[in-house]
Amino acid sequence: MAAQVSHTVLRLEAEDVRNLKDGINFQKNNKDGKCYIIYKANGELRACRNQCKHQGGLFIKDIEDMDGRTVRCTKHYWKLNVATMQYVNPPDSFMQDELEAVLSETDGSLELLELNPPDPWTAEPREAQDLQAGEITLTYITHACMELKAGERRMMFDPWLTGPAFARGWWLLHEPPKDAMDRLMEADLVYISHMHSDHLSYPTLQHLSKKRPDIPIYVGNTSRPVFWYLEKSGVNLTNINVVPFGVWQNVDDHLRFMILMDGVHPEMDTCLIVEYKGHMILNTVDCTRPNNGRLPHGVDVMMSDFAGGASGFPMTFHGGKYTESWKANFIKNERKKLLNYKAQLVKSLQPKIYCPFAGYFTEAHPSDRYIKETNTKNSPAELNELIRKSCLNTLTWTPLPGSVLDLAVALNNRSNETAITDPPHGTKIYKDNWEFDLYLNQLNASISAEIFKHKHWIQYYYNWAGFRNYNLVIRVIETDDDFQPLNGGFDYLVDFLDLSFPTERPEREHAYEEIKNRVNVMRHVVVNGLLWDDLYIGFNNRMSRDPDVYHHKFWNHFQTELPLSAPDWQHFLQICSQTQENGSSNGCSVS
């Protein structure tokens, strides 16, 4: 069975991209004659093959369309709204399979990408067999961590059981069951969806490695390796399996699983299909467009994120339009859109059981009270209520730590209250102790690192990072926990056009961002060569920008494309030592 790959089906050069009009654009690949539709609105692009899902007819402009969103099939006059990729005539029929539209920031070209094969789970199909009560159970542990028991096997998803995520910004909302760590130790295999620290939790894996260093852990073959930081972390795990996308991995005669990529973040995000005796469980985790939007219909169980708020935007921004009322209105609208999107996705896929998870975190540290109060999140109960209104045959599950879903019982009678067992009365549900000092002391240890006695660490670090030839200037200011400038802290400019470090902003026209970073997190990131997710997703900075533009190329580089090996700070200190011996009083000079 060949691995699933992403390939380009149509490429438009920059001039052709600029010529795309708002609304519907019909395009043809002159090399193979295949036809496509590109819909443009508000600078956003959506695309699909020009082929009706009913019987393969070609779409043309719909003369009855008044808003420029609908095309009509020449065969049986079916109509497709390309703004939503939903067929509107007949209603409630199909969703069009969407292509990923990728704009190049280098040359302005556009590529339409398609996964091949698009639905690999259909390979080697298995008929669903009857299940006995207790044969398949799902136990919710906390956040994105579930334990799947299938026959004699136990599989754990994304174990984050202790410690913070994103340096110090995220903490567990739910108290894991008392035996959660024991369950992890006894698992037959572990799936970790991606490298973010609320899924790949090194504090958790440190505990695991002491007793089970050889436990089989499975990850997808992402371009940025999930365990890129393993050696530096000091965690000893010896049985990490990187598997190709879209290929069944057989655990035993009845149990198998398949890892799929995300359409928006294929470099890091993955999702999972597990099948036992022909019964499928779909876990989309954090994927924005899991498997590029093409997913199996009618699975037995579907799980997905739901909460929102997994980003510093807009809470950590200030100046300009970023008033408290603007932030509150934006957050309210974004959460509502996410809620409706998840409900629509469930409606389109029609799983037998749906569970919202992977959103149970809190900004627990007292210094992040503002974030906690501002960063409101969706309610899983509200999402499930919305789903029940449109999916009458879907059982919804709002999990609590230790609650158990028995799949066989649920499938036999979805109204059977015994299908879901909640934790005993009096069980502690929410955490109230996170051992802040233990983990913040680890961050604080970086503040006094030897490299920060030499101001040229800045030049050395950004040369290591390797981002340049981009007309952006940033000012980075080290602060205390409350984002007040730190006495004796570094305050510097970086000009990424030529990767220089001026004392004043250049006179030429340029984009500008001012970034205030908590000193313990920033220095921890610098010393260890970590990604800037700890700063941005962890709410550990405050930002303003002029103009108010998101610089994707810059943030994508510092969040996903930094070198896999940390800066060689020993080499840096050797240079500094040699420079001092030569009589320099500046510390060092790094070319």
Swiss-Prot record:
Signal peptide: none
GO biological process entries: CMP-N-acetylneuraminate metabolic process; N-acetylneuraminate metabolic process
Recorded coiled-coil stretches: none
EC number(s) per entry: 1.14.18.2
Listed cofactors: [2Fe-2S] cluster
Residue ranges of every copy of the Rieske domain listed in the record: 12-110
Binding site for [2Fe-2S] cluster: 52, 54, 73, 76
CDD domains, A to Z: Rieske_CMP_Neu5Ac_hydrolase_N
Pathway noted in the entry: Amino-sugar metabolism; N-acetylneuraminate metabolism
Main location: cytoplasm
Keywords: 2Fe-2S, Cytoplasm, Electron transport, Iron, Iron-sulfur, Metal-binding, Oxidoreductase, Transport
Reaction(s) catalysed (UniProt annotation): CMP-N-acetyl-beta-neuraminate + 2 Fe(II)-[cytochrome b5] + O2 + 2 H(+) = CMP-N-glycoloyl-beta-neuraminate + 2 Fe(III)-[cytochrome b5] + H2O
InterPro entries documented for this protein: CMP-Neu5Ac_hydroxylase_Rieske (IPR037339), Cnh (IPR027033), RibonucZ/Hydroxyglut_hydro (IPR036866), Rieske_2Fe-2S (IPR017941), Rieske_2Fe-2S_sf (IPR036922)
GO cellular component, one term: cytoplasm
GO MF term list: 2 iron, 2 sulfur cluster binding; CMP-N-acetylneuraminate monooxygenase activity; metal ion binding
Similarity remark: Belongs to the CMP-Neu5Ac hydroxylase family.
Protein name: Cytidine monophosphate-N-acetylneuraminic acid hydroxylase
